[in-house]
């Protein structure tokens, strides 16, 4: 069975060192192998040559959080240009409050 990939926001990333997580965010800027992403706060994400992101699109990113809290993109799904991030924030909080429903 695969390990669960909990949903998080930017402010939760330091707690996720060494883990694979999901994070919904907006790709604000993409330059080379780095993207600036906003998900309840801005952070830089390392890309590979296989990753192409459209600026101003929302994505669900599956990322690896490194021990230094840097973020490496593993895969993503384009969610388009209109996501209610307030609802996503509530989903994240709900999923952590009732983690047995989502992670076990």
UniProtKB/Swiss-Prot annotation:
Molecular functions per Gene Ontology: damaged DNA binding
Keyword Protein transport: no
Function: As part of the replication protein A (RPA/RP-A), a single-stranded DNA-binding heterotrimeric complex, may play an essential role in DNA replication, recombination and repair. Binds and stabilizes single-stranded DNA intermediates, preventing complementary DNA reannealing and recruiting different proteins involved in DNA metabolism.
Keywords from the named record: DNA replication, Nucleus
Family assignment from sequence similarity: Belongs to the replication factor A protein 3 family.
Classification via InterPro entries: NA-bd_OB-fold (IPR012340), Rfa2 (IPR013970)
GO terms for cellular component: chromosome, telomeric repeat region; cytosol; DNA replication factor A complex; nucleus; site of double-strand break
Subcellular location: Nucleus
Cystine connections: none
Superkingdom of source: Eukaryota
Protein name as catalogued: Replication factor A protein 3
Quaternary structure, from the entry: Component of the heterotrimeric canonical replication protein A complex (RPA).
GO biological process entries: base-excision repair; DNA replication; DNA replication, synthesis of primer; double-strand break repair via homologous recombination; mismatch repair; nuclear DNA replication; nucleotide-excision repair; telomere maintenance
Gene name linked to the record: ssb3
């Amino acid at each position: 069975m695969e390990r669960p990939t909990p949903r998080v926001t930017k402010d939760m990333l330091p707690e996720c060192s060494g883990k694979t997580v999901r994070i919904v965010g907006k790709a604000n800027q993409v330059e080379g192998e780095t993207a600036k992403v906003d998900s309840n706060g801005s952070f830089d994400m390392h890309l590979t040559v296989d990753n192409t992101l459209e600026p101003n699109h929302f994505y669900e990113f599956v990322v690896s959080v490194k021990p230094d809290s840097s973020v490496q993109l593993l895969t993503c799904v384009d969610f388009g240009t209109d996501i209610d991030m307030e609802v996503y924030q509530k989903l994240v909080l709900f999923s952590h409050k009732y983690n047995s429903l989502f992670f076990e």
